[in-house]
């Protein structure tokens, strides 16, 4: 997936010659102390940041060669902090994951991802009024909706601190 990634921010070396191999069907976790660069590495791997050096590939193709539309159909990203303040319903936020953005979401897909993430009980509620853990589950459902094909998510799911606001029940049952 990536070889020799390096990134400087100002004079500070954030990522130094990191290589990562990710395989389909596997779950990989990055573990380290706060400030170690895990979130930055995730942003490099997903194309949100451009490295100073190194190469990145998704499904054998250089990340830079993917169009934004094609990339959004193959990988979904849940960032650590989501700054969504829009007064939308839970269903609207989840449907935002469909590609292209604004495409009509299949009601069966919405129902499936809402059930998988425990968001079915949040139907009709407004996103800003949700707790942090509920918002986190909605964001996970949005990512799953983005990748949902043929009854299951198909593609690469990149999650940054996906359980940080979840209670113990959802921490154990979602991932």
What are these regions (language model features)?
Residues 107-122:
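Conserved ABC ATPase "signature" region
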Residues 22, 54-62:
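Conserved ABC transporter NBD signature motif
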Residues 62-76:
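ABC ATPase NBD coupling module
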Residues 152-161:
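Catalytic Walker B motif of ABC-type/P-loop ATPase nucleotide-binding domains
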Residues 46:
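Helix-to-loop junction immediately C-terminal to a conserved catalytic motif
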Residues 126-130, 134-135:
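Conserved ABC ATPase signature
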């Amino acid at each position: 997936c990536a070889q020799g990634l390096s990134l400087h921010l100002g004079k500070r070396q954030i990522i130094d010659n990191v290589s990562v191999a990710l395989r389909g069907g596997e779950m990989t976790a990055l573990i380290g102390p706060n400030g170690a660069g895990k979130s930055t590495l995730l942003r490099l791997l997903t194309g949100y940041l451009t490295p100073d050096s190194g190469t990145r590939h998704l499904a054998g193709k250089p990340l830079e060669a993917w169009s934004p539309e094609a990339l959004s159909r193959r990988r979904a990203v849940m960032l650590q902090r989501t700054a969504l303040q829009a007064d939308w319903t839970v269903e609207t936020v989840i449907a935002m994951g469909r590609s292209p953005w604004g495409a009509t979401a299949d009601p069966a897909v919405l129902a499936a991802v809402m059930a998988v993430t425990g968001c079915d009980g949040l139907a009709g509620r407004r996103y800003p009024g949700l707790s942090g853990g509920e918002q986190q589950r909605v964001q996970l459902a949005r990512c799953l909706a983005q990748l949902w094909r043929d009854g299951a998510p198909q593609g690469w799911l990149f999650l940054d601190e996906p359980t940080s606001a979840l209670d113990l029940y959802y921490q154990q049952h979602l991932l």
